[in-house]
Amino acid sequence: MTILVLGGRGKTASRLAALLDQAKTPFLVGSSSASPSDPYKSSQFNWLKRDTWERPFEQAGKHGLGTISSIYLVGPPVMDIAPPMIEFVDLARAKGVQRFVLLSASTVEKGGHSMGQVHAYLDSLAEVEYVALRPTWFMENLLEDPSREWIKNENQIITATGDGKIPFVSADDIASVAFHCLTEWGSHKTEYVILGPELLSYGQVAEILTTILGKKIIHRSLTETGLAELLVKKAGIPADFAAMLSAMEVDVKNGPQEVLNNSVVEVTGNPPRYFKDVAEHEKHVWA
């Protein structure tokens, strides 16, 4: 039985693939940029091109793998995310897939917008098992532009979160939870809100980076509109997506993210990583 990992080059999927490889668990990576030089067996898969959706099921046999029985679902980079994902879930079910692990978000309830619609659809299917992973904000987002560039070149983190606190979580821990959910059957229909071990404001994150990098890093908090405009102008993010991201950041000010739980250790047996440890390991990115 083979696991299909979608979003193959993403933060969680790439880490999940490494864990599956280490465990010698049969898997296939689905990616729009799949090539023969990939480190793992892979297949073309593009959410925006339906003619690629069946290729992983065809390629599994060509790669000498068994039938695909489980899928790690990472959605496409579009606003209306649910229709193509639900259509693909139906295709996969017709191919014999029995379990789905969905990457959603802590702020998206079952039945809510985007991934929440996919979550609700999976829950409505009597014959499949699923786990919805609902992680909070990724620590590793600071390793990518525009945040990386702001920290490296401007000595600042720019958000619209004010002094609101977030239980930042590492993509390593999300991947570890996904690994256990995909390889240890029996969870049936459930969800895990995946949180880090501590609550941090971006001001506190800046203080940690100041200590680790040996230079003063500040947190600059903008208005919702100000951040959206900056993301469009400096990062080239589409206006509608930038507006959504900015609204999510402003919501942090009201404290809905200020919670902790034990999901990571309960599922994996290991405690989640602290931001200071991730930052110390990755500090070369901001040097």
Swiss-Prot record:
Asked if Oxidoreductase is a keyword of the record, the answer is: yes
List its EC numbers: 1.5.1.44
Concerning Gene3D superfamilies, the annotation shows: NAD(P)-binding Rossmann-like Domain, UDP-galactose 4-epimerase, domain 1
Q: Does the keyword Oxidoreductase apply?
A: yes
Question: What reaction gets catalysed by this protein?
Answer: festuclavine + NAD(+) = 6,8-dimethyl-6,7-didehydroergoline + NADH + H(+)
Give the metabolic or biological pathway. Alkaloid biosynthesis; ergot alkaloid biosynthesis
Q: Which domain of life is it from?
A: Eukaryota
What top-tier enzyme class does this entry carry? Answer: oxidoreductase
Q: Which UniProt keywords apply?
A: Alkaloid metabolism, NAD, Oxidoreductase
Q: Name one GO molecular function term.
A: oxidoreductase activity
Q: Name a biological process GO annotation.
A: indole alkaloid biosynthetic process
- NCBIfam families attached to this UniProt entry: ergot_EASG
PANTHER family reported for this sequence: PRESTALK A DIFFERENTIATION PROTEIN A, PTHR43162
Q: Which family does it belong to?
A: Belongs to the fgaFS/easG family.
- State its role: Festuclavine synthase; part of the gene cluster that mediates the biosynthesis of isofumigaclavines, fungal ergot alkaloids. The tryptophan dimethylallyltransferase ifgA catalyzes the first step of ergot alkaloid biosynthesis by condensing dimethylallyl diphosphate (DMAP) and tryptophan to form 4-dimethylallyl-L-tryptophan. The second step is catalyzed by the methyltransferase ifgB that methylates 4-dimethylallyl-L-tryptophan in the presence of S-adenosyl-L-methionine, resulting in the formation of N-methyl-dimethylallyl-L-tryptophan.
Which protein are we looking at? Answer: Festuclavine synthase II
Specify the species: Penicillium roqueforti (strain FM164)
Taxonomy, top ranks, is: Eukaryota, Fungi, Dikarya, Ascomycota, Pezizomycotina
Gene for this chain: ifgF2
